[in-house]
Amino acid sequence: MTLCFSAKYRSVSRYAMVLLATCAALSASVGHAQTLRVALAEDPDVLDPTVARSFVGRIVFASLCDKLVDIDEKLTIVPQLATSWVWAPDNKALILKLRKGVTFHDGEKFDAAAVKFNIERHKTMAGSNRRGELSPVTTVDVLDDMTVRLNLSQPFAPLLAVLADRAGMMISPKAAAAAGSNFANKPVCSGPFKFHERVAQDRIVLERYDGYWDKASIHFDKVIFLPIIDPTVRLANLRSGQFDFIERVSPSDITALKTDSRIKISRIPELGYQGLSINIGKSDQAQKNPLGKDVRVREALELALDRPGMVQVSMDGEADVGNQWVSPSNPYYAKNVPIPKRNIARAKQLLKEAGVPNPSFSLMTPTTADGQRLAQVIQAMAKEAGFDVKIQSTEFATSLNLADKGQFDAYLLNWSGRADPDGNLYSFYGCKQPLNYVGFCKPEVDALLDKSRSVREPAERLKIIEQIAAITSKEHAILYLYHRHWLWAQTKKISGMRLIPDGLLRVQGLKPN
């Protein structure tokens, strides 16, 4: 019997209805190795790399949009659309040699002019979430057809790591100009698969691009991405043969899956974090709640949380306890700011000093099973200190829009992380940065963030990051809880998955056994 559930009912509490269109799409591909079927934990946001910001969107982009460079299993920068690069002697320019023979999905040539268009679009387009990532890039020079130079206002150590993600994704200038603000409805990139269709909350279908420069590495004709919130339903469909890969397997299912000879589990420690973001200045709403306007209340909340217990209860041990934007095992972890231990007595004392022994706030939470479980754990732990936490379950894309507007008290936010720590830090604490949902703004931190970006020597850079950690940790605007393990499950009928630390599924090299 085919297990196929409507997007409307892909939630923790609903299991019964069937969406015929999705079933038909899936059933048509059953038994055909040429179609790769991937279940996502959420529906991706916009399919435009300039404005996109979801992890699941990055999974789709990995099949759709090639980047200038990529990372490998050891976080080494490796070629993709750029074949080589060299820094200027003063480290204030990066010169990239581009791959010849690459075309976009509309047949247009990829060249230096296309790179210039894309970088400038990332920097100037209204609503761009890449602007902060590329802020040190001042101008882009086309040196010849296949050579481009990125000029910088100051040395920028994370630049190559930035170009290994959405800021380095190249879209067709011709298609972008023609589509305008509607580009995301039919994105045109240069990756191994081209866009075919999207049905919101149901499926994204990509078809093989025959003109792909590395087509020998592609062994499927089609990729179908299906958002299914409930991990139980994702797993049931994998076991029934409807899916080939599922992401974010529920940690509680890992033990049982180890005995299933048909299924392979991949575990990848994430580069990012699970955090609790608090609105301290994003909007007027921050001043309407004790949590937003009094740092003592925020410190009390942090002291009410038992991180090791949280990892065991909400993640079944499939995460590493943390308190910063990178994990304690990362070379850029600031050891001068250790993980705080739970202290209920001190938390109650702080609330008493703040004059709010029983503060109440809403916790905006994704509708995923993991998100709901974590919110309930936080609710129970915080209650012991006197907090009344009201869980506000919100669809993921909607939660991002509300966070943008500052319409929240606190927000459970997963950040998938970047190869360079700057990607976990700059856009979240810089005064005018697009991912600064909490409204944190300190000129001294802005100066340190810029200084950190300009230093390439690791030991010197760590000293700057330690200063940033010392300041931000006292504000408790983002409570870093833990660092998850990306848990992928797949049929053993397919081989070739690479365990890259960003947790993304790369289709190059995947093939049926």
Label every model-predicted segment.
Residues 488-513:
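Long beta-strand-rich cores associated with HINT superfamily self-processing modules
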Residues 73, 99-129, 139-141, 187, ...:
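Extracytoplasmic/periplasmic ligand-capture domains
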Residues 27-33:
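Sec/Tat signal peptide C-region and signal peptidase I cleavage site
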Residues 6, 97, 131-175:
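Surface-exposed binding/hinge segments that line
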Residues 39-89, 117-120, 188-189:
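N-terminal lobe/hinge region of extracytoplasmic solute-binding protein
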Residues 1-12:
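N-terminal secretory signal peptides that target proteins for export/translocation
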Residues 15-27:
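Bacterial N-terminal signal peptides
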Residues 89-90, 144-146, 200:
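Residue-level recognition of beta-strand termini and adjacent short loop/turns
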